Curated annotation (Swiss-Prot):
GO cellular component, one term: plasma membrane
Gene: irtB
Family the entry assigns: Belongs to the ABC transporter superfamily. Siderophore-Fe(3+) uptake transporter (SIUT) (TC 3.A.1.21) family.
Domain notes: In IrtB the ATP-binding domain (NBD) and the transmembrane domain (TMD) are fused.
Stored PANTHER family: ATP-BINDING CASSETTE SUB-FAMILY B, ATP-BINDING CASSETTE SUB-FAMILY B MEMBER 6
Catalytic activity, EC: 7.2.2.-
Cited Gene3D superfamilies: ABC transporter type 1, transmembrane domain, P-loop containing nucleotide triphosphate hydrolases
GO MF assignments: ABC-type transporter activity; ATP binding; ATP hydrolysis activity; ATPase-coupled lipid transmembrane transporter activity
Protein's recorded name: Mycobactin import ATP-binding/permease protein IrtB
Length: 576
């Protein structure tokens, strides 16, 4: 945990971290000295010359004042470090997210990322002052007191040193017992949170299927897993707590017995023995504090682990290359490209060339790799083997800005942000002037939509575009893609879920765009590709047919069969 925290400290604060560490250790030494000073103070106070206690009281006062000054300075440095870690971590996580490989962002890892981002607030700021400082003190103070006791009473000091080893070992064993169960409990809590969100978002489908009872849904499974993990966690924590409690009691008995034995032998006076009992109590106190800190330590360990998981997530490689021409439609080439999601292969040794300004349709059965090709062109994924070339430049060697500026994408399920229609369109290019914005709105026929709304393009779309229909969301999405001055336009199943009217609007918008672009269209509905110059038919991750629409229809192969089935489905009707 401490290693992870140190790694999160920005480079310009490493000096502050070193000073903080030195002062924290100095604070421990001062507190240990102040504790052991009680022995000569009490001995003098109850001895034959009580006035001899004044110098020892002076030393104790000086140690207390010095400790207060050091602790105040340490707290200030701790807050400084905490805010530095917070700021550095938030920027690191935010900068990392746009470059994380999409195949890493599974449901589980997305929950991890969400929890990491949500917890990088007060918990990180308070980590140093409220947890790290007490943790260092709780671990080092008993050892420092034991070392100081060696100078007063070597047998008692050595016994105290042995007690440090035993108690820290008992605490380590206790934490070891519960750590794995705590990890499982944390994972099930995250999973339960995700299922609750999913349960709320899918109420329409669940009610239609009569699956509204949580017990009959995945929420019930997640709740059961959470309950089981909580029971296992308690089953592990209780034996660990009993083990540490037993070790603490044995240490107290051992040290008190040692002090009594030394007093009986005459090696300690009665006042010294009384003071030793006070010192022993002070010696055991940090272990109790450490035990109380354990839940917070484990929680923080989980938080730092989630942050580390996001920062260590695999990212897309990027270089410093840039295409020679960022405005003209580029030549796109797949050179022996192989790609898979984890162990699941999707594309197998795919090669083709798309000429500048051409419109290419990619069709084929579900799962054949069509959308994956678009993702590779857009730079959302990178090939496992082979290369994707943009005007002869390997896309993996492009800098991030060039890679993102090269393509404009219309997704099958468009996502609209919680803002106005205008705001959502300008996401494509915030610097677009009014003429370019108006042209994109007109081409996508968004003007027909805004004309019906009381606030026009200032109308709010709601979270994820909930205030608009599916076709209306797609029109806004297309306007967003068209307003972006990208030389490559990628369209992924943009009409698959639309009615005939909206499908026609989408197709007209895409074909009416006069910007010189290289276009790649993935479609199941063949009406969407009637203007394509070329068709690639994919099956099983390979290109099995390549040619013009008329040429492939005349060949009577897979595409022809696909085409005929589309027409048969279009002619299908219910008869009485």
């Amino acid at each position: 945990m401490i290693r992870t925290l140190i790694a999160l400290v920005p480079a310009d604060k490493r000096g502050t971290l070193g000073l903080y560490t030195v002062l924290t250790v100095l604070s421990v030494v001062i507190r240990a000295a102040g504790t052991v000073l009680l022995v000569p103070l009490v001995a003098a106070l109850f001895g034959d010359t009580p006035q001899d206690a004044w110098p020892w009281l002076g030393w104790l006062t000086a140690a207390t004042a010095a400790g207060w000054i050091v602790d105040t300075t340490t707290s200030r440095l701790g807050f400084d470090l905490g805010f530095a870690v917070l700021d550095h971590t938030q920027h690191d996580v935010a900068d990392r997210m746009p470059n994380i490989r999409l195949d890493w962002l599974t449901a589980e890892n997305t929950a991890t990322a969400r929890a990491a981002i949500a917890s990088t607030g007060p918990e990180l700021v308070g980590l140093v002052v409220n947890l790290l400082t007490p943790l260092i003190g709780a671990v080092l103070l008993p050892a420092a007191i034991a070392v100081a006791l060696v100078a007063v009473s070597p047998p008692l000091g050595l016994a105290a040193l042995a007690g440090v080893v035993v108690l820290l070992g008992a605490m380590w064993a206790s934490n070891r017992l519960s750590r794995k169960a705590d990890t499982v409990a944390d994972e099930t809590n995250s999973a339960f949170t995700e299922r609750i969100i999913e349960f709320a978002r899918t109420q329409q489908a669940l009610r239609a299927a009569r699956r509204v009872e949580p017990a009959r849904s995945l929420v019930g499974d997640a709740l059961g897993a959470q309950h089981g993990a909580g029971v296992r966690l308690l089953a592990m924590q209780i034996p660990g707590q009993l083990l540490f409690s037993l070790a603490s009691q044995l240490a107290l008995i051992l040290l008190a017995g040692m002090a009594t034995w030394l007093t009986v032998r005459g090696e300690l006076s009665v006042p010294e023995a009384v003071a030793m009992i006070v010192v022993v109590a002070r010696y055991l106190e940090p272990f109790t504090s450490l035990s109380e800190l354990t839940p917070a330590i484990e929680s923080t360990r989980g938080t730092l682990g989630r942050i580390r998981a996001v920062l260590d997530a695999p990212t897309l490689t990027a270089g410093d290359a840039a295409p020679a021409d960022t405005k003209s439609a580029p030549r796109i080439e797949f050179d022996c490209v192989t790609f898979g999601y984890g162990d699941h292969p999707v594309l197998d040794d795919v090669s083709f060339v798309l000429e500048p300004g051409s419109t290419t349709a990619i069709v084929g059965p579900s799962g054949s790799g069509k959308s994956t090709i678009l993702s590779l062109i857009a730079g959302l994924h990178q090939p496992t083997e082979g290369r994707v070339l943009i005007d002869g430049v390997d896309a993996a060697s492009l800098d991030d800005e060039s890679r993102r500026a090269a393509t404009s994408v219309v997704f099958q399920q468009p996502y609209l942000f919680d803002g106005s229609i205008r705001d959502n369109i300008l996401v494509g290019d915030p610097g677009a002037d009014e003429d370019r914005l108006a042209a994109a709105v007109r081409l996508a026929r968004v003007d027909e939509l805004t004309a019906r709304l009381p606030n026009g393009d200032a109308s709010k779309v709601g979270e994820a575009g909930a205030a608009l229909s599916g076709g209306e969301r797609q029109r806004v999405s297309i306007a967003r893609a068209l307003v972006k001055p990208a030389p490559v336009l990628l369209v992924d199943e943009a009409t698959s879920a639309l009615d005939t009217e909206n499908e026609a609007a989408v197709v007209d918008a895409l074909t009416a765009d006069l910007r010189h672009r290289t276009r790649v269209i993935v479609a199941h509905r063949l009406a969407s590709i009637r203007h394509a110059d070329r068709v690639l038919f994919l099956d099983g991750g390979r290109i099995v047919e390549d040619g013009t629409i008329d040429g492939l229809l005349a060949a009577g192969g897979r595409f022809d069969e696909f085409w005929r089935r589309q027409h048969e489905a279009a002619d299908w009707q219910i008869t009485h």
